[in-house]
Amino acid sequence: EGTHELHEMVSSMRSVKESSNIDTRFPHALESFKARQWQLLGQEYLKTTEKYRTNKLFFIDKNPNNFTFIGAIKLAIPNAKIINAKRHPLDSCFGSYKQLFASGQPFSYDLTELGEYYMEYERIMSHWKEVCEGFFLDVNYEDVVSDLDSQVKRILEFCELPFEESCLRFYETKRAVKTASSEQVRKPIYSSSVNLWRNYEEKLSDLIEILEPLLRELPEQDQPKSFVSH
């Protein structure tokens, strides 16, 4: 069941911190959480998100900042499933750069800060892969575009859910969508946004410089032209 970009995970953490009389400031207060606090966190999160959902087995929290709290989510909600939606680093960053967000995400309006944020995201996710093995699934946008059927089945298998044909017709949903993808989810899958960054490569030099360690690891055809020519 779809919801929105929920902020209840952080607010629930603060609530449990205060009710447990933990004086340490958030987020360092999480270091003082014991088994009881983690249990309370899971209960508080599920309780405060009830208003966004019905009685479906699973619901989706699309908040992109949740990646920083994957360890906490695992301790608080052990049966949660984390989907790490990825795409080419330059497409991912450029997509954020050209988007005017309703609030927050100030780093996304500066290519240097955006690149640094993305590198930190990669570092944090590498850590979670080591300590939370099997808890989340990487899904590449480009793979979804090229083979939606296989990727949908892969995601549903990870979530232990049966396949439904309606999953391939997501664009038919009547549900209100309030995130930056509100227009895209009303359309079938399209490929025009794959490698969109190449149209602006000359203007993305600052971003490319920061992301170079990641970009060098990609297949040659996915690297900036300036890399391939050297």
Across the structure, where does each feature detected by a protein language model lie?
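Structured core elements
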Residues: 59-61, 81-86, 137-141
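Phosphate-binding active sites in nucleotide-utilizing proteins
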Residues: 1-77
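Active-site donor-binding loop signature of nucleotide-sugar glycosyltransferases
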Residues: 2, 87, 141, 187, ...
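Short N-terminal helix/helix-N-cap motif within the alpha/beta-hydrolase-1
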Residues: 68-71, 94, 149
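PAPS-dependent sulfotransferases, especially Golgi type II membrane carbohydrate sulfotransferases
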Residues: 25-57, 96-138, 146-230
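Conserved phosphate-donor/acceptor-positioning beta-strand/loop module used by diverse small-molecule
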Residues: 73-96
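Conserved nucleotide-binding/hydrolysis micro-motifs of P-loop NTPases
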Residues: 5-6, 87-92, 143-146
